[in-house]
Amino acid sequence: ELLREEMLPAVREQGIAEFCDVFCEKGVFSAEESRRILLTGRQYGLLPKIHADEIEAIGGSELAGEIGAVSAEHLIVCPPSGIASMASGGTVACCLPATSFYLGAAYAPVQDMVQAGVPVAMATDFNPGSCPCLNMQFVINLGCLKYRLTPEEVLTAVTLNGAAAIDMADKVGTVEAGK
């Protein structure tokens, strides 16, 4: 309730964020708690984003598509139902292969996402706890090696789709007149 009743209104009042992002994972926020937080954020003009399906699939990717989240991050254990929901909701799947590498975890089912029509972005997920990697070249290599994306698909994932994951594809992400 602190988030919904005090923090989100303060963020709106101060104009310090464009997005409301929640970590939907066992032991953090449930899918229902995440829904309430994201919908409240939307009421305050904040676009929804969600970190989901990193360790366990508890409904976060399904929620992302259902509410039309701008993006869903991690998605290491994203189930087919989550992929279908993100495809129908227009959610960008922001996959973080360096996190899988450093955790020794599985890799997100990116080929299933691509085949379902989910736009895939890739990023580093730099943080001191699970991914001490700032190297986008490494992320690009993992995209080709572990996600089995073509170089063209990886380039799109780290440019245009990366821009889409922050709702800026109309302004940046490609080299063309007007951008």
Model-predicted segments: where are they?
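Metal-coordinating catalytic core of metallo-dependent amide/deamination hydrolases
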Residues: 1-58
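Active-site-adjacent C-terminal substructures of enzyme catalytic domains
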Residues: 47, 57-171
